[in-house]
Regions:
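C-terminal transmembrane helical hairpin of 12-TM major facilitator-type secondary transporters
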Residues: 291-338
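Helix-loop-helix hairpin linking two adjacent transmembrane segments in secondary transporters
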Residues: 122-175
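Extracytoplasmic gate region of multi-pass secondary transporters
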Residues: 16, 229-271
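Helix-to-loop junctions at the C-terminal end of transmembrane segments
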Residues: 47-59, 142, 280-293, 376
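Helix-breaking motifs and short loop linkers at transmembrane-helix boundaries and internal kinks
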Residues: 27, 78-84, 292, 313-315
């Protein structure tokens, strides 16, 4: 949890509460702020898809990631050169992706060894803890400016890394390659305690060979066709929330300060997002496994769309508070539901599918700030970009409902 709080909560998301201070100091404008955000998300995308090529000890990689995250965070506060910021944010994004994957796998393995599967959800509250911490610290000490904020977060990250350094001891086992998809599958299996019915997997995690009959062979081809179509739509529609949530996740304090000038509330909306994220991480894995994942995804998209709309049509403290929680609550749940759907479609071979889906999500994240920042700079408001994000989420939800209906109709033929 601490590792993810540092790598993601600070390394990836501390930019959000500090961006208003950077804008206020004149060291950056909103357009370049959008570029910095997209550089970070591009780095995360590259880091995520290169994890499979890294054959390193998980614990050692987490240590390296924590140390680099702390150092890069300090660098953000000691220079004003945009090209250095861009490089730091890009590299920091890749490091945070590696930290997420390797820390997840290390933590889940340790919990399995200790027989403490029920605590797996706590690992994924880490980003929320980091978001809450950075948001509250900026709210309390924002007057010190962005530079000291970056340096302070870097020093705090270094202290937290030192605190857990001894925990990440190198494992004597053979190190297997890691990927976000494999980590995702592992986390989903551990979080729920058993596999989905029909996956041909025993609760112990060992694969049981499915019995094949002439009937199953006869229906194999149409089943594969249906699953292939569903898999394609999963990849396409999983990219939607990447675009949908990221505009708010990047610019929420900026948007709130513009709507509520002089109010102390804008600095608190980001921590509210973090609290909701933690709650969602703990609750999502406890939902019944027999519920349709695509319907759950559609519901999560609608929640995030409603959260975005709340801040636009009701630009008050209450509206932004509700919006922050509605966007944060399904943040982790969306990933979990997509993992489960990938496992339903491809069983033990879901890693490739989840990798493609993760790539689509990453592309959405990169595109969000690149669209929002120029629109805001041109119109003087984020509302058009936010409405576009909300519309995209609703369109994605509608697409999931249609795919679900068509898939069920085909399977009953």
């Amino acid at each position: 949890m601490v590792a993810l709080a540092v790598a993601l909560g600070v390394g990836r998301f501390a930019f959000t509460p500090l961006l208003p201070l950077m804008l206020q100091s004149g060291s950056i404008d909103i357009r370049h702020g959008g570029w910095l955000a997209s550089f970070n998300y591009a780095g995360y995308f590259i880091g995520a898809i290169t994890c499979a090529a890294l054959r390193v000890d998980h614990a050692r990689m987490v240590r390296v990631a924590l140390a680099i995250t702390a150092a890069l965070t300090v660098v953000m506060g000691v220079t004003d050169a945009f090209w250095i910021w861009a490089l730091v944010r890009f590299v920091g994004g890749a490091i945070s992706a590696w930290a997420f994957v390797f820390a997840s796998q290390w933590g889940l393995r340790r919990l399995a060894e200790l027989g403490a599967h029920r605590w797996s959800g706590v690992i994924y509250t880490g980003p929320g803890v980091g978001i809450v911490g950075t948001g509250l610290l900026v709210s309390a000490a924002g007057g010190l400016g962005a530079k000291l904020g970056w340096i302070g977060f870097g020093l705090i990250s270094a202290a937290l890394a030192a605190l857990v350094w001894h925990v990440f001891e190198a494992a004597p086992r053979r190190v297997a390659p890691a990927s976000p998809a494999v980590a995702a599958e592992h986390s989903e299996a551990v979080a729920v305690g058993h596999d989905r019915p029909g996956s041909h997997t025993r609760p112990s995690g060992r694969t049981a060979p499915p019995a094949r009959s002439s009937a199953s062979t006869h229906h194999a081809r149409p089943d594969r066709t249906i699953h292939r179509a569903d898999a394609i739509w999963l990849v396409v529609l999983y990219g939607v929330p990447g675009f949908g949530y990221i505009i708010t996740a990047t610019f929420l304090p900026v948007i709130a300060r513009a709507a509520l000038p002089g109010s102390p509330w804008p600095d608190l909306f980001w921590p509210m997002f973090g609290v909701a994220l933690m709650a969602g991480a703990l609750l999502a894995a406890r939902l019944p496994l027999h519920w349709d994942n695509r319907m759950l995804l559609a519901g999560a998209y609608v929640l995030q769309a409603a959260g975005i709309a709340s801040g636009i049509v009701w630009p008050t403290a209450a509206g932004f508070s509700i919006g922050s929680m509605l966007i944060g609550l399904p943040f982790t749940a969306i990933t979990l539901f997509a993992m489960r759907e990938a496992r339903r479609l491809h069983g033990e071979h879901a890693a490739g599918l989840m990798g493609y889906a993760t790539a689509a999500y990453g592309i959405g994240q990169i595109a969000g700030p690149l669209v929002a920042a120029p629109v805001a700079a041109h119109t003087g408001s984020f509302s058009p970009a936010l409405w576009l994000a909300a519309f995209a989420l609703m369109l994605g939800a509608a697409g999931l409902l249609i795919v679900t209906r068509v898939s069920k109709r085909r399977s009953h033929r």
